[in-house]
Amino acid sequence: DIRPSRGLGDVYKRQAHNFHSTHKHMPPGYLGEDPLAASFNVFRYRAQNVGVLTFLLPFMEQQNMFDRISQEVNLNLDIFGVDNTVVPPAQPWWRGAQSFTMAQNQMGMFMCPSTNIKEGRITGALIGTWGRPNSNSGTMGLAGFGGATGRALGKTNYLGCAGGLGNVNPTNAWARYKGVFGNRTDYNFGAMTDGSSNVFAFGEVTGSLSRKQRTWVHGWLGCGIMPTAWGLPVKRDDQRWYRFGSDHPTQVQFCMGDGSVQKFRTQDGTGSGRWGKYIPISAMQDDNTPSLD
């Protein structure tokens, strides 16, 4: 295991803010298929599928780990699809031997002490969202490894907030609710026009529970984002891989764009409440800033 957790705020405020200071923008939420594509299939594996936490490694004294990944997987935001003609090749991270080895590091700083995600049976290797052009519909997908491989892969309790459904096609109604982190995004603080203190940046995830057994969990190298379209779990048995969630009773912790950590009541993230508060706070440019109280 590498370094114990200092909590959600440390991952975002210290590491992502340092990334922004160096690069003048936030890291991408993940490197997925073309976000403007006319169709979506998470199982096509046509992208690097590297998530936001990987880009933060150099800012948490893990430059060597980042270098070993980037030697095998091209992390250029502008190279879409699989391209073996570039150096390094644009390929899914798990096709690189070094990258696959690095992904098995159990990163203590990405884990919440309140949740035992190491018991998960299947570890997500990539996650992505998509919105159908000229509509109000969309979807998300997760693919991962089970068995001994899934147990060996490093896991995370923290993911970047994609807003309602991520940075979908601008003709999709969900585009209004895009968040700080998305598919190949490079937003800066100025993009948070709702105010950095009013926008979710990172949040807690637990994976899925089925009959009190943790099934799907999220791998830190490939899983980068979580949308808010599917609300929050009201009770522990409602925890799912497609929602933020925590094992803290009745609440989920989020790190806001300014680095402050706020507790959000789970009952405010379901039913009509998600439209009144949860989804608007997850969006950074929807001109709606409801109170966290």
PLM feature segments, named:
Residues 1-12:
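Single conserved hydrophobic/aromatic residue that forms the stacking wall/gate
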Residues 10-293:
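Surface-exposed loop/linker segments characteristic of extracytoplasmic
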